[in-house]
Protein backbone atom coordinates (compact mmCIF):
# COMPACT_ATOMS: atom_id res chain seq x y z
CA UNK A 1 0.00 0.00 0.00
CA UNK A 2 1.32 3.45 -0.87
CA UNK A 3 0.85 6.50 1.33
CA UNK A 4 1.43 10.17 0.66
CA UNK A 5 1.26 13.03 3.14
CA UNK A 6 0.77 16.61 2.02
CA UNK A 7 1.30 19.70 4.11
CA UNK A 8 -0.39 22.50 2.21
CA UNK A 9 -3.42 24.74 2.05
CA UNK A 10 -6.11 22.07 1.83
CA UNK A 11 -8.42 24.03 -0.50
CA UNK A 12 -5.60 24.58 -2.95
CA UNK A 13 -4.11 21.09 -2.73
CA UNK A 14 -7.38 19.16 -2.93
CA UNK A 15 -8.22 20.79 -6.27
CA UNK A 16 -5.37 18.70 -7.73
CA UNK A 17 -7.07 15.41 -6.78
CA UNK A 18 -9.65 13.44 -8.71
CA UNK A 19 -13.10 12.77 -7.28
CA UNK A 20 -13.31 9.78 -4.90
CA UNK A 21 -9.54 9.28 -4.88
CA UNK A 22 -8.46 9.81 -1.25
CA UNK A 23 -8.77 7.39 1.69
CA UNK A 24 -8.13 9.82 4.54
CA UNK A 25 -8.12 13.59 4.98
CA UNK A 26 -6.71 15.08 8.17
CA UNK A 27 -6.85 18.86 8.48
CA UNK A 28 -5.74 21.34 11.11
CA UNK A 29 -7.66 24.41 9.93
CA UNK A 30 -7.55 27.94 11.32
CA UNK A 31 -9.53 27.99 14.57
CA UNK A 32 -11.01 31.49 14.19
CA UNK A 33 -9.51 32.58 17.50
CA UNK A 34 -8.02 35.79 16.11
CA UNK A 35 -4.39 35.31 17.14
CA UNK A 36 -3.13 36.09 13.63
CA UNK A 37 -4.58 38.02 10.68
CA UNK A 38 -5.08 34.77 8.72
CA UNK A 39 -7.16 33.44 11.61
CA UNK A 40 -9.84 36.15 11.86
CA UNK A 41 -13.32 36.11 10.41
CA UNK A 42 -15.98 38.79 10.93
CA UNK A 43 -18.35 36.28 12.47
CA UNK A 44 -18.76 32.62 13.29
CA UNK A 45 -21.14 32.42 10.33
CA UNK A 46 -18.40 33.65 7.96
CA UNK A 47 -16.00 31.12 9.44
CA UNK A 48 -18.51 28.29 9.05
CA UNK A 49 -19.11 29.36 5.43
CA UNK A 50 -15.35 29.20 4.77
CA UNK A 51 -15.07 25.79 6.43
CA UNK A 52 -18.11 24.62 4.44
CA UNK A 53 -16.07 25.10 1.26
CA UNK A 54 -13.33 22.98 2.80
CA UNK A 55 -15.80 20.26 3.81
CA UNK A 56 -17.38 20.16 0.34
CA UNK A 57 -13.97 19.73 -1.27
CA UNK A 58 -13.13 16.96 1.20
CA UNK A 59 -16.42 15.28 0.37
CA UNK A 60 -15.56 15.45 -3.33
CA UNK A 61 -12.12 13.84 -3.04
CA UNK A 62 -12.85 11.18 -0.41
CA UNK A 63 -13.52 7.63 -1.48
CA UNK A 64 -17.00 6.34 -0.52
CA UNK A 65 -15.61 4.60 2.58
CA UNK A 66 -12.99 7.27 3.30
CA UNK A 67 -12.55 9.14 6.58
CA UNK A 68 -11.76 12.66 7.57
CA UNK A 69 -10.64 14.21 10.81
CA UNK A 70 -10.19 17.82 11.76
CA UNK A 71 -8.68 19.53 14.76
CA UNK A 72 -10.37 22.41 16.54
CA UNK A 73 -10.24 24.04 19.95
CA UNK A 74 -13.52 25.93 20.36
CA UNK A 75 -16.43 23.70 21.35
CA UNK A 76 -19.14 26.19 20.32
CA UNK A 77 -17.62 26.51 16.85
CA UNK A 78 -17.28 22.72 16.64
CA UNK A 79 -21.04 22.48 17.23
CA UNK A 80 -21.68 25.01 14.43
CA UNK A 81 -19.35 23.12 12.10
CA UNK A 82 -20.99 19.80 12.94
CA UNK A 83 -24.42 21.32 12.27
CA UNK A 84 -23.18 22.52 8.87
CA UNK A 85 -21.80 19.07 8.07
CA UNK A 86 -25.04 17.34 9.12
CA UNK A 87 -27.16 19.71 7.04
CA UNK A 88 -25.01 20.20 3.93
CA UNK A 89 -23.03 17.01 3.36
CA UNK A 90 -23.39 13.26 3.15
CA UNK A 91 -20.85 12.67 5.89
CA UNK A 92 -21.87 10.39 8.73
CA UNK A 93 -20.60 11.65 12.07
CA UNK A 94 -19.01 8.87 14.11
CA UNK A 95 -17.45 10.41 17.22
CA UNK A 96 -15.43 13.14 18.83
CA UNK A 97 -11.80 12.43 19.62
CA UNK A 98 -10.55 14.66 22.42
CA UNK A 99 -6.87 15.45 22.72
CA UNK A 100 -6.60 17.05 26.13
CA UNK A 101 -3.43 19.15 26.07
CA UNK A 102 -2.38 20.28 29.50
CA UNK A 103 -0.81 23.56 28.36
CA UNK A 104 -2.74 24.29 25.19
CA UNK A 105 -1.75 27.72 23.93
CA UNK A 106 0.93 28.22 26.58
CA UNK A 107 4.55 29.11 25.91
CA UNK A 108 6.79 26.17 25.06
CA UNK A 109 8.74 26.52 28.31
CA UNK A 110 5.80 24.77 30.03
CA UNK A 111 5.59 21.80 27.66
CA UNK A 112 8.09 19.54 29.42
CA UNK A 113 7.50 20.18 33.10
CA UNK A 114 8.09 16.50 33.91
CA UNK A 115 11.70 16.47 32.66
Predicted regions and their residues:
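Core catalytic lobe of class I
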Residues: 1-115
Amino acid sequence: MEYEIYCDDCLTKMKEFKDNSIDLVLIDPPYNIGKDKWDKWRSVEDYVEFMGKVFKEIERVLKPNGSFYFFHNDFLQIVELQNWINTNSNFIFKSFLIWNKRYNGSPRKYYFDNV
